[in-house]
Each structure stands twice: as C-alpha cells, then as structure tokens.
Amino acid sequence: MRLRIAARLLALLALALVALGTAITRAQSPELPIFDTHIHYSAPDWIEYPPERILGILEKAGIRRALVSSTPDDGTLTLHAKDPKRIVPILRPYRTRGDMGHWWQDPAVLAYVQERLQKNRGVHKGIGEFHLFGGQTGTFVVKRITELAVQENIYLHAHSDELAIIELFTLEPRLRVIWAHAGMSSGPQAVGALLDRYPTLWVDLAIRNSDVAPGGTLDPGWRAVFLRHPDRFLAGTDTWMTSRWEALPGSVTEVRSYLSQLPRDVAEKIAFRNAERLFP
C-alpha cells in the first residue's frame, strides 16, 4: 500500500515538475511579435483616434506590422503615409459602410476599385476585406475582382462562408485568398478540409479567440489543424468598430496566450512569420 501511495506521489510530482518547467519556459520566452492581418481604420475612427494614436496603440501591443483596409480607403493610405514599414495596405471595396450589402453587384464599386488600384499602383497588396457569401459570386463585379487580383498579383481578403470560398476558387483557381475569421463560425475540421483542398488559401483568426481557446485553453481540434497546417494561419484582431481600438491590447494578449500553448516554431509562424512570407 505504501509503495502504491509513494508511486502515485512520485507520478504527481513528475507531472507538477513538467507543468512548472513549461510555465517557466513560457515566462522566459521573449514576447511574440505580431503581424496583425485584420485591421481597419475607417472614417468613424478618425477624430477620436488620429494616426499617431493608432500607431502608438499598435506599437504598445507589439504589433510590428499590420494588414490594413478601411472604409473608405483614405484611412489606410493615411496610416501608410505615417508608417509605411508597419502598415501593409489592402483596398476595401467600400466607399461607405452602405456598400457592404451590395458591393458585389454594383458597377460603381468596381469602378472605385479599379480607379484606386490605378491611382496608387503597387501600394495595395490585396482587395478586401469584403463580405461575400455563397450564391453571390456569379456577378460580373466579382468575376472582374478575381481577374484584377490575378492580374495585379495581389490577395483577396474574404469575409465569407465555406461555400463562397469554394465558389471563388472555382471561378478563378489562380487566386490567393485570405479567409477572414476562419469563416467566423467554421470549425477546425471544415477549415482544415478547405486548406487541404486549396494550397493558396490562408486563414486569419480574428474574432475567433473564444472558439480557438475557450476559457483560455487551446481547443484540441484547433491545435490539431494548426499543427497540420502551420504555414497557413495568420494572427488578427479586427478593429471593425471604434470601440475595438480599446479592446485591441487585450485581444492580442489572448492571441499570445493560446499561441504559447503550441510549439514555439508553430506559434511564431502564426504570430508573424506566415504573414511576413506573404507580405515581405
């Protein structure tokens, strides 16, 4: 009996030492820099958050680079002019928030996109973030957007369901797509299946912290797909409304917390290395 108790105590002690060692290793590891692939700086933000304040928030949060799209595009270009090394511009096809619900069938939006790309040639590294769902991809506007993406060698940033992602690649297999929010509600199995199917699909994890790591603990399903596709996931926060700027540091802390539960090399890829490879 005493031997059994002693053996159990030794086993518990061993587990405690492993946990302690892991905690110490995490504490001693340098803080992960972040390449945030989901930032907006739209018109409602501009008065309360001038560019210098925005850049200060990013710096304090350890966001060394950011993929930025805005409604309208002027917000993105303003930030880029202030800090071109940190800010990577992409072109959102929204002149106002009202464009969100119909941009995919509005020739005027297409004209706006073409004009901005031409006027600022080489500045925008993608088109998006845009909202597009299954059954909406069969318009001339969407077809032309996919053609522009291939022609200009730039990415699409799609806030879409799984069906729309499939439809986009069916429309133009040469696309390079960043799937915003991992589909917002798609689970790790569905995300993994699309990554298996499309080698030029990447996934940003903005707004998915509570799904990826409920209660702060990395979900086993998400962990498995991260390990299976370590080169295809991207960190993100999403400042979709003005109040999100105050929430951004906390969101970044949550991202670092669940990434710390992965092997360091995988964590670094998701935190910044994958995005740096896409946007060198």
Per-range role (PLM):
Residues 2-4, 8-12, 20-35, 47-69, ...:
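Mid-to-C-terminal alpha-helical segments outside catalytic/metal-binding sites
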Residues 23-134, 144, 148:
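Mid-domain alpha/beta scaffold segments of enzyme catalytic cores
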Residues 38, 58, 149, 181, ...:
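Conserved, mostly hydrophobic/aromatic
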Residues 42-44, 73-76, 96-98, 133-136, ...:
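Active-site environment of divalent metal-dependent phosphoester hydrolases
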Residues 44-51, 69, 106, 110, ...:
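Solvent-exposed, acidic/flexible segments
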Residues 50-57, 75-79, 109-116, 141-145, ...:
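A general structural detector for well-ordered alpha-helical segments in enzyme core domains, enriched
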Residues 81, 89-91, 104, 136-235:
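Catalytic pocket-lining loop regions of alpha/beta-barrel enzymes
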Residues 121-124, 199-202, 209, 250-256:
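Active-site gating loops and adjacent loop-to-helix segments of metal-dependent hydrolytic enzymes
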